[in-house]
């Protein structure tokens, strides 16, 4: 698999990390080298599997000005860890929450106020945006082709 831990990261992995910064920031892996924080145009916050889809698409397109940050603990919300992770990008980047679930499902409604509060405390004059599926009564489309099309649309919006 493309995303495996190395023996060197085993020490790091022995404890739970509430927020995981972009794997491309670790120079030891073979991921694309990201631009300096002042040149990053988007910070994508997410949780779960969508991260791996986004990372694979960014690598394929060789995009170096988008950073992904995974929030692994939704409650209690990891304000300190998130503050540390987003601070280098606060002045220059747009901040977006991405999820594959419909807007009325998933983590959006439980994390948006915490993330916005964190941005406000960093005195970032930006509003957190949402990219994901439209609100729906059902968590899934029921059709594999439609699901794949929607997933591609989400990824394309993130990478544009």
Annotated model-derived regions:
Residues 1-8, 12:
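Single conserved hydrophobic/aromatic residue that forms the stacking wall/gate
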Residues 6, 28, 52-55, 77, ...:
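Short helix/loop capping segments that flank catalytic or ligand/cofactor-binding pockets
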Residues 14-25, 45-51, 72-81:
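A general structural motif
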Residues 36-42:
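A short, charged/proline- and glycine-enriched loop
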Residues 38, 57-67, 88-93, 118-127:
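Secondary-structure transition/capping motifs at alpha-helix termini
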Residues 45, 94-102:
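Short glycine-rich or small-residue beta-strand-to-loop segments that form or flank ligand, phosphate
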Residues 51, 56-89:
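Generic long, charged, amphipathic alpha-helical segments
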Residues 85-88, 99-160:
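Peripheral docking tails and interdomain loops at the edges
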């Amino acid at each position: 698999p493309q995303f495996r831990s190395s023996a060197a990261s085993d020490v790091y992995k022995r404890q739970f990390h509430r927020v995981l910064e972009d794997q491309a920031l670790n120079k030891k892996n073979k991921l694309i080298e990201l631009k300096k924080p002042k040149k990053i145009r988007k910070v994508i916050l997410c949780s779960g599997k969508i991260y791996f889809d986004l990372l694979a698409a960014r690598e394929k397109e060789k995009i170096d000005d988008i950073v992904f940050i995974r929030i692994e603990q939704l409650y209690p919300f990891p304000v300190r860890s998130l503050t540390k992770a987003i601070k280098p990008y606060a002045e220059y980047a747009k901040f977006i929450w991405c999820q594959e679930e419909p807007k009325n499902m998933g983590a959006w409604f439980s994390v948006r106020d915490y993330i916005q509060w964190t941005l406000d405390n960093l005195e970032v004059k930006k509003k957190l945006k949402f990219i994901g599926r439209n609100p729906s009564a059902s968590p899934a489309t029921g059709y594999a082709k439609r699901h794949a099309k929607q997933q591609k649309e989400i990824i394309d919006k993130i990478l544009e």
